[in-house]
């Protein structure tokens, strides 16, 4: 996972998991509303009366209808990342 997405992914995942309604503002000013069904590196699948695939490069702002507790997700991601680095370091030391 790219370092720049270490906040983005857990935040979007918390919005998706908790089914929090969001307003997504595009760079051209259009406001989309719905729930985040899924997302990947390039797009967000927004569910409302229809599903919309929104390209991330077109998004200016994501505004949740209520606050989201993504801190646990970020901490968990950091712990997993740290554990992965420790495993890699151990593997390197064993091959030397």
UniProtKB/Swiss-Prot annotation:
This protein's UniProt keywords: RNA-binding, Stress response
PROSITE patterns assigned to the protein according to its UniProt record, in alphabetical order: SM (PS52002)
UniProt-listed InterPro entries: Hfq, LSM_dom_sf, Sm
Residue intervals of the Sm domain: 9-68
GO cellular component: cytosol
Its biological purpose: RNA chaperone that binds small regulatory RNA (sRNAs) and mRNAs to facilitate mRNA translational regulation in response to envelope stress, environmental stress and changes in metabolite concentrations. Also binds with high specificity to tRNAs.
NCBIfam families: Hfq (TIGR02383), PRK00395.1 (NF001602)
Protein name as it appears in the record: RNA-binding protein Hfq
Source organism of this protein record: Histophilus somni (strain 129Pt)
């Amino acid at each position: 996972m790219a370092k720049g997405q270490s906040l983005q992914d857990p935040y979007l995942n918390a919005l998706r998991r908790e089914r929090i309604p969001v307003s997504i503002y595009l760079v051209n000013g259009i406001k989309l509303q719905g729930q985040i069904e899924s997302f990947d590196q390039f797009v967000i699948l927004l569910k409302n009366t229809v599903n919309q695939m929104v390209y991330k490069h077109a998004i200016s702002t994501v505004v949740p209808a209520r606050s989201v507790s993504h801190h646990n997700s970020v901490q968990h991601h950091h712990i997993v990342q740290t554990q992965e680095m420790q495993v890699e370091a151990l593997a390197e030391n064993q091959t030397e």
